[in-house]
Amino acid sequence: MAETDIRAGSGITALRVTAAALFAGFNLVPLYGLVAWHWDAFQLLLLYWGETAILFVCTLAHIACIPPAQLGTMVVNGKSVPASRLMMVGFFAVHGGLFLAGHLFFLCVLFSGAKLAHIGGVAGFVHTFFIASGAWAPLLLVALAGALDVLTGPYHPAFIDAFARVLHVALARPKDAVPGQAVGSVVGGLYVRVIIMQVALIFGAFAATVVGSAAPLVILVVLKTAVDFVIRLSAISGAPPAPLWSGVQPTLRG
């Protein structure tokens, strides 16, 4: 039983490390884009905006997996009511969606120059800056890594627990937090990371524009890659043990 427990724990940890490696791979692709594809500051900022959008969707998925008892309360029509998953996901979908829209508008106003003059609407924008530019490839890595994060996170979909029970393994969840604290830990980490990273990247883009060189962007990409990887590995090493043996004896059928 202990051997099965260790194998399951190693498997979960391996998936989490794989997610961290995929994020690192995403962060390194812009270096190739800057050198080989001649990406400019605007293209790089749009790429990282796309990363933020994907991580935001993954955050909504994390919230949808938090037990209702840990969601806390919300004020509806002046009354405090127990929050539901649908309420929380809906609230942060609107809040985060407005944030992403405002952020994109800000980037376009400051860094697009004349690039948007002949784009031809939203479809042309997506095709030019996310398909034809090659940005879709690193963003695919982010989507895969985000999916692994959701599946192996402390609050994961119910079918993961069902699959674990088939293997006679119970996945450990974090200790019950103060109602509302679980949501704060999931959402707060994303917003803090996004604000710090995006401010640094925007200043780097300004510097690259002023000096007329991609060197500041290259330095920022390398630093972002290192910081992201260290943060994710630290989170993995500090996570509670993933599997706990359920105590259910497997039944052999002849």
Regions of interest found by a model, annotated:
Residues 68-83, 154-189, 243, 247:
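Juxtamembrane inter-helical linkers in multi-pass membrane proteins
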Residues 101-176:
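Membrane-proximal helix-loop-helix units in multi-pass membrane proteins
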